[in-house]
């Protein structure tokens, strides 16, 4: 819609001046919901009002007419804005905040009584640019990302920033890993070129990851423009000042800085030079695996029951965010992993220190986000007080270390606590200037201590003791005139005045007494002193608020000068919180320090699933631990056994142990020896993907295909029931070929759970594959799941027993047992007519051997396969050939 069409639609020419102002601003922000400040309310008009009233559940009313058209209107109180913004941001709306830039009095002085108050948009709030504490999750980052695809389309550059903490990063990502990297970061908003709107990438980001995409015109990412933006922002002459970065990284960084400038109206906090991330320095965990393992959220997207929720006993918000980042990005460098483990071990060996530090950390605040609000002029006195309390607690924490160790601390601990020495100058500045009861709103006044500035003290004295000052002046005039009955009074017409009776008028001789009014019984005067006092009393509140704002701004500028130190302090405190947390959970839940190797070891003794164990503990139940011994020579465990026996839990727990170990934490086991895992892939369970029109089987095959394409020798794969979403013959064939491919081609560690007992024969000719099963105890028709993993293969699935446990009617269970008995007779050559009367879906290995069966054809086909020579594409084509035999 062009400007002319817009004005015509809203009858611009006959609108009031105020409504014309609104329409001018709205046209400049058509993609936003515009909140227009009108006195004590933010109001919305026309379509915005209709939309907002529905989303926010507030009344829709009218604001007169514009021509013949009624103007829809709704509004929210300015002091409750954050509550309503929360709902709008949750619904992914882009919100433009339009504020009054002058008071009505200033507008009147500028342009007369008909002048419209000057207004303009002061910021645009989007999901990726929030800094308000009440609008963002405290225990996780709030990333805005910009994604730029390289010209060869083999890699992408990703810049991501957390505006609330002023952190910015840039990374190059292989094309096949883009979705996995986005899944790691979980950005609230992604900037993408308009040219990619109809691409498969954009479709996957929206449908698979459900992330918000904000499209920008292609020129928004232009290299020359973005380079200039970077140089201007960081006041550099050469882009090399950023480091060794690619053209696409320049575009990603520049576009994100430009977007921040547009949404924050140039009011961007000082961001450090982007930290260049090596993609391969973190374990790759694809989005499906993150969902399956429930690492930072459960399958419903909430915290309860997730690994993060189980491990998170941090006591600070910034510590919680750091733990979130650790779990999202496990390390792959042995030296860095061991460095973290050594820190954890130090605190585990000093639990008394841990206890004291955790209590002191509770007295600190989220100074990262406080500092950002200060630099963006959106802070309150509470933010400064938070910094003060944190500085005080930090010095005490450092004292705890030196009380215990003196100057004999390990270097890696000394490095962490170095910033805890504090900053006496900064502490004293805040302590001497900011009142302990400072309000949240600067306009309320009362933020600066009276003694910090003499003028503040004077103005507050006037506000608090105005009557005493008037009384003092009255006493002075009584003494000067000799009129004991002299009074100082007030009315709304002439304000303060000196009131004497008519008979005493001859005693007023001093010309400083200026006649104002004569009544029947009295004469009224004023003086220059009284007029000055009256003016000061009338303006004291306004003057003190104005002065306090000036002083507050100066104090904030002095705090900003210490920004680098405060960020180091925040990093130190969050690190202490996380490693004390690791020590705490190691002691609380009996975790052990893992050992890392550079081979394919995965030797876990008495491993446990931390989330399940914690849940059982609440019910006073014990978790059944299990060993897992993978190595170069025994890379694949093929696990058979019934449902409910614990196969999936066993698979998940070992993947989780690898993740926990590589973030630098102790692990739930008696011992753990692990060769570093570069990638973890999990295919456990699937639901029909109705949004993308994919069945369970298609979803499973897509996930399995991605695993086979992206895994390396150092990866860990956990697969559960591959092939179960199709017929028995297809399923066994697919599972068989997948196992062969992992064994012969990938040669990586793998836990493979299945109901296809026919696969267990593969251990006869795949030397690195071993059979394991779940121990069962039978008593008549009853079975007991022991949950122990033991060497060997299951001889049957116990499906009917599980059905009985699930509560199926007894008649159904009895009938199922009768049919099973007939099937079992069929497989031994008896009851030959059962196939036609009961089922045609028997196991392919149980059909009659004296006929030319599908099984024999499959056997013949398998004998001609050369697994080492098959590409993934050829393997998939082979699957379709096998299907034709059915």
Swiss-Prot record:
**Which PROSITE patterns does the record associate with it?**
DNA_MISMATCH_REPAIR_2
Sites where the protein binds ATP: 641-648
**Which SMART domains does this UniProt record tie to the protein?**
MUTSac, MUTSd
> For this chain's UniProt record, which GO biological process terms are given?
mismatch repair
Q: Name one GO molecular function term.
A: mismatched DNA binding
Report the protein's function: This protein is involved in the repair of mismatches in DNA. It is possible that it carries out the mismatch recognition step. This protein has a weak ATPase activity.
| HAMAP family referenced in this protein's UniProt entry, alphabetically | MutS (MF_00096)
This protein is called what?
DNA mismatch repair protein MutS
């Amino acid at each position: 819609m062009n400007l002319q069409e817009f004005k015509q639609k809203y009858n611009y020419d006959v609108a009031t001046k105020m409504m014309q102002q609104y329409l001018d601003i709205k046209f400049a922000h058509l993609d936003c919901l515009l909140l227009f400040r009108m006195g004590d309310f933010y109001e919305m008009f026309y379509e915005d009002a209709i939309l907002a009233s529905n989303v926010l559940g507030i009344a829709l009313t009218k604001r007169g007419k514009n021509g013949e058209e009624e103007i829809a209107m709704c509004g929210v109180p300015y002091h409750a804005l954050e509550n309503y913004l929360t709902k709008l941001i949750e619904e992914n709306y882009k919100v433009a905040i339009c504020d009054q830039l002058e008071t009505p009095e200033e507008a009147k002085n500028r342009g007369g009584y008909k002048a419209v108050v000057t207004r303009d948009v002061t910021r645009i709030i989007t999901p990726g640019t929030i800094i308000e504490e009440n609008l963002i999750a405290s225990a996780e980052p709030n990333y805005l990302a910009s994604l730029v695809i390289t010209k060869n389309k083999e890699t992408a550059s990703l810049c991501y920033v957390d505006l609330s903490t002023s952190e910015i990063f840039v990374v190059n990502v292989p094309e096949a890993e883009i979705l996995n990297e986005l899944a790691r970061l979980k950005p609230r908003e992604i900037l993408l070129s308009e040219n990619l709107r109809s691409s498969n990438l954009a479709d996957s980001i929206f449908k698979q990851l459900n992330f918000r995409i904000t499209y920008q015109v292609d020129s928004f990412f232009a290299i020359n423009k973005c380079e200039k933006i970077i140089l201007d922002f960081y006041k550099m002459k050469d882009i090399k000042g950023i480091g060794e970065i690619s053209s696409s990284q320049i575009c990603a960084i520049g576009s994100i800085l430009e977007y921040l400038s547009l949404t924050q109206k140039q009011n961007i906090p000082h961001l450090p030079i982007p930290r260049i991330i090596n993609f391969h320095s973190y374990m790759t965990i694809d989005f499906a695996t993150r969902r399956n393992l429930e690492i930072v959220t459960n399958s419903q997207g909430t915290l309860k029951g997730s690994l993060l929720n189980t491990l998170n006993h941090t006591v600070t918000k910034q510590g919680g965010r750091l733990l979130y980042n650790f779990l999202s990005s496990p390390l792959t460098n042995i030296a860095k992993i061991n460095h973290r483990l050594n820190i954890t071990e130090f605190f585990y060996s000093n639990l008394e220190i841990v206890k004291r530090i955790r209590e002191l950390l509770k007295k600190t605040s989220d100074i990262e986000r406080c500092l950002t609000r200060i630099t963006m002029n959106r802070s309150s006195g509470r933010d400064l007080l938070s910094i003060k309390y944190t500085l005080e607690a930090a010095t005490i924490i450092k004292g705890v270390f030196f009380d215990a160790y003196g100057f004999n601390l390990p270097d890696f601990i000394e490095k962490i606590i170095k910033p805890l020495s504090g900053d006496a100058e900064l502490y004293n500045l805040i302590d001497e200037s900011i009142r302990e009861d400072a309000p949240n709103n600067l306009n309320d006044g009362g933020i600066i201590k009276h003694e910090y500035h003499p003028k503040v003290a004077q103005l507050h004295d006037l506000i608090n003791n105005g009557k005493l000052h008037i009384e003092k002046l009255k006493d002075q005039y009584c003494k000067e005139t000799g009129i004991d009955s002299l009074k100082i009074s007030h009315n709304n017409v002439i304000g303060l005045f000196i009131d004497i009776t008519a008979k005493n008028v001859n005693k007023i001789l001093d010309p400083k007494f200026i006649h104002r009014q004569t009544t029947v019984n009295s004469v009224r005067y004023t003086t220059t002193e009284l007029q000055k006092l009256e003016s000061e009393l009338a303006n004291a509140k306004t003057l003190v608020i104005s002065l306090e704002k000036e002083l507050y701004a100066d104090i904030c500028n002095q705090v900003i000068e210490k920004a680098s130190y405060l960020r180091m302090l925040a990093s130190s405190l969050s690190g202490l919180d996380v490693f004390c947390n690791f020590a705490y959970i190691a002691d609380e839940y009996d975790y052990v320090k893992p050992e890392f190797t550079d081979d394919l070891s995965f030797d876990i003794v008495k491993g446990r699933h931390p989330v399940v164990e914690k849940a059982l503990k609440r019910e006073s139940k014990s978790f059944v631990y299990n060993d897992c011994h993978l190595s170069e020579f025994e890379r694949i465990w093929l696990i058979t056994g019934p449902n409910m026996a614990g196969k999936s839990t066993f698979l998940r727990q070992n993947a989780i142990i690898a993740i926990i170990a590589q973030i630098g934490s102790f692990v739930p086991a008696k011992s753990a020896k692990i060769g570093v895992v570069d990638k973890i892939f999990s295919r456990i369970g699937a639901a029909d993907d109705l949004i993308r029109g994919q069945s369970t089987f298609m979803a499973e095959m897509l996930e399995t295909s991605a695993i086979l394409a992206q895994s390396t020798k150092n990866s860990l794969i956990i697969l559960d029931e591959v092939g179960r979403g199709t017929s028995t013959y297809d399923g066994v064939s697919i599972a068989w070929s997948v196992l062969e491919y992992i064994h012969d081609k990938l040669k990586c560690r793998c836990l493979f759970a299945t109901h296809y007992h026919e696969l267990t024969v593969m251990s006869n000719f795949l030397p690195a594959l071993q059979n394991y099963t779940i121990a069962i105890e039978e008593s008549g028709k009853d079975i007991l799941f022991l949950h122990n993993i033991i060497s060997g293969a299951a001889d049957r699935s116990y499906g009917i027993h599980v059905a009985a446990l699930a509560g199926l009617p007894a008649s159904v269970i009895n009938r199922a047992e009768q049919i099973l008995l007939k099937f079992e007779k069929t497989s031994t050559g008896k009851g030959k007519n059962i196939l036609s009367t009961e089922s045609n879906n028997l196991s392919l290995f149980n059909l009659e051997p004296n006929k030319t069966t599908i099984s024999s054809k499959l056997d013949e086909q398998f004998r001609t396969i050369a697994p080492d020579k098959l590409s993934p594409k050829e393997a998939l084509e082979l699957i379709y050939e096998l299907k034709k035999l059915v």
